[in-house]
Swiss-Prot record:
HAMAP family recorded: HisB
Cross-referenced PANTHER family: IMIDAZOLEGLYCEROL-PHOSPHATE DEHYDRATASE (PTHR23133:SF2), IMIDAZOLEGLYCEROL-PHOSPHATE DEHYDRATASE HIS7 (PTHR23133)
Catalytic activity of the protein: D-erythro-1-(imidazol-4-yl)glycerol 3-phosphate = 3-(imidazol-4-yl)-2-oxopropyl phosphate + H2O
Name listed for the protein in its UniProt record: Imidazoleglycerol-phosphate dehydratase
Pfam families registered for this protein in UniProt: IGPD
Length: 197
């Protein structure tokens, strides 16, 4: 059974198309107009082994906030759609990823309940190119709200802002991959004692 999610979201501020195949090979086609964000979404697809298409046309003449936020909302909705009934998945996933001096620890529960815990080093450089580093938390908040997952992201240390953000996306990719993969020992079984996710 295909596990593909496709979401189109259009407002006065942005037009977003996201398509994700959870059982892909990591092929990506990303264009948001925000170079560093494209790089992070590429990491998400490649390291999650998700085939991921993202096309966003936003009001970048103002700034990148709406473009980044609306893309994350659509991505979360597409991920949730692709999960389907969640029967037979592992449900939980975690991964720790280093990037030189930085380290990210990510744990996810595909619980149907949105919750985010996010910590990263203080006093990071405020910008990476045109990317405002404070948007990383907002991306995660937006994704969690639509994907309906509990997500814990912890960066205990790091110096380089690029590395700090990138290792979060790589660890998120792997954690989502592990949680959404099918468990051969649980075929046909919903991973919940209450019978609903």
């Amino acid at each position: 059974m295909s596990r593909v999610g496709r979401v189109e979201r259009t407002t006065k501020e942005t037009s977003v198309l996201v398509e994700i195949d959870l059982d892909g090979t990591g092929k990506t086609d990303i264009a948001t107009g925000v170079g560093f964000y494209d790089h992070m979404l590429d990491q998400l697809g490649r390291h999650g082994l998700f085939d991921l298409t993202v096309k966003t046309d936003g009001d970048l003449h103002i700034d990148s906030h709406h473009t980044i936020e609306d893309t994350a909302l659509a991505l979360g909705a597409a991920f949730r759609q692709a999960l389907g009934d969640k029967v037979g998945i592992y449900r939980f996933g975690n991964c720790t990823v280093p990037l030189d001096e930085s380290l990210a620890q990510v744990t996810v529960d595909l619980s149907g309940r949105p919750y985010l815990v996010h910590t990263e080093p203080e006093n990071m450089a405020p910008m990476i190119g045109e990317y405002d580093v404070t948007m990383t938390r907002h991306i995660l908040e937006s994704f969690v709200a639509q994907a309906q997952v509990a997500l814990h992201v912890h960066v205990p240390y790091g110096r380089n802002a690029h590395h700090i953000v990138e290792c979060q996306f790589k660890a998120l990719a792997r954690a989502l991959r592990y949680a959404s993969e099918r468990d051969p020992r649980a075929a046909g079984i919903l991973p919940s004692t209450k019978g609903a996710l």
